Amino acid sequence: MSVNLSKNGAALQAAYKDVLDEKTKTDWALYTYEGNSNDIRLAETGDGGLEELVEELSSGKVMYAFCRVKDPNSGLPKFVLINWTGEGVKDARKGMCANHVSTMASFLKGAHVTINARAEEDVEPESIMEKVAKASGANYNFHKESNRGNEGPQGPVGSVYQKTNAMSEIKRVGKENFWAKAEKDEEERRIEEHRRANVEKDRLERERKEREQREAEERERRFRERSKEIDGHRKQQEEVEKQQTVPASQRSVNPREMFLQKERSLPESGSVSAQPEQFTASQQEEENIYQDATENQNIYEDTPQEDPVYETGVAEDSGMCARALYDYQAADDTEISFDPDDVIIQIEMIDDGWWRGVAPSGHFGMFPANYVELLE
């Protein structure tokens, strides 16, 4: 966007004319922007020359100064235009204001020397006056040569020495020390911030690694526990399947044979009368052994055509009872069959691995002990 000189045009023009007019004490005028806009306003005017002007330049602003000085060679008034861009101005603002320099030069026309400055060393009064002297040197020599024939005896050569302003010098040195200290402090601050940022970064990285390590260890622990649990279930299932598939005659402990041997060794009761031809030998032996129990409980009738049948309900006189955990199919007529959750009553623990009892179907026989759980 272009610079706006019309909003405060009257004040801008009046200050400019005061500097041009040798009859006024005002010998410098300073211009700047209103905030971040492109509107130019009058910042300050004064009559203290370059020494006073440079004290008003701000490191955080873009400013334009127009100053009247006296040519050290000819003593004639000369005009200096200073385009000031402080070191603290943002780069985007610098780029925008750079396009306004030519417009300001056209407005503050008549300058013999133009200076583009960014730091205090660019606007030292001695340096500016040297540039003014060099700019007017050719014209000055021309005028001197043209008037040399009319001059009388030459007097002492005048000196261009200017008395040092003590207060101005103190201020200048103080500002130099101030800015040097400020730059040093700023550099130390940046170094400290960078160090703190690195420390914080290292801390976060260390915490992240520790957290990831803990999570990995926890996952490994859970994995081992789960694997152990799965292996236990698998072994248990394999054992159950093995028990189901191996015939009773091939099991490592065959309590059924032991049971049959015990039955054969018992003496036959003489009170039992001869049975009809329908009774098998195994049924006769079984009835001889359990005659007393069956008579007391009245579980089955003395009919040779049917197998003994027992009540399946869990009554007070049902003896030891158990609930089936798995299904089991009898290998022969000396064993009983049952399904999961069936209740087996009148259990006798004849062996660590094999018991016998009455199944829900009413049949009495042996079954594997690890297929059931006892009921309280």
From Swiss-Prot:
Residues 2-133 form the ADF-H domain. This is Drebrin-like protein B. GO terms for cellular component: actin filament; anchoring junction; clathrin-coated vesicle membrane; cortical actin cytoskeleton; cytosol; dendrite; early endosome; Golgi membrane. It is found in: Cytoplasm, Cytoskeleton; Cell projection, Lamellipodium; Cell projection, Ruffle; Cytoplasm, Cell cortex. Adapter protein that binds F-actin and dynamin, and thereby plays a role in receptor-mediated endocytosis. Plays a role in the reorganization of the actin cytoskeleton, formation of cell projections, such as neurites, in neuron morphogenesis and synapse formation. Does not bind G-actin and promote actin polymerization by itself, but excerts its functions by interaction with other proteins. Required for the formation of organized podosome rosettes. It comes from Xenopus laevis. The keyword DNA-binding does not apply. One of its GO terms (molecular function) is actin filament binding. It is a peripheral membrane protein. Residues 268-283 have a biased composition (Polar residues). GO terms for biological process: neuron projection morphogenesis; positive regulation of axon extension; positive regulation of dendritic spine morphogenesis; postsynaptic actin cytoskeleton organization; regulation of actin filament polymerization. Residues 175-231 form a coiled coil. Disulfide bonds: none annotated. Residues 317-376 form the SH3 domain. PANTHER family: CORTACTIN AND DREBRIN, DREBRIN-LIKE PROTEIN. SUPFAM superfamilies: Actin depolymerizing proteins, SH3-domain. The gene is dbnl-b. Residues 202-288 are annotated as: Disordered. Keywords: Actin-binding, Cell junction, Cell membrane, Cell projection, Coiled coil, Cytoplasm, Cytoplasmic vesicle, Cytoskeleton, Endosome, Golgi apparatus, Membrane, SH3 domain, Synapse, Transport. InterPro entries: ADF-H, ADF-H/Gelsolin-like_dom_sf, Drebrin-like_SH3, SH3-like_dom_sf, SH3_domain. Belongs to the ABP1 family. Pfam families: Cofilin_ADF, SH3_9. Residues 202-242 have a biased composition (Basic and acidic residues). It comes from the Eukaryota.
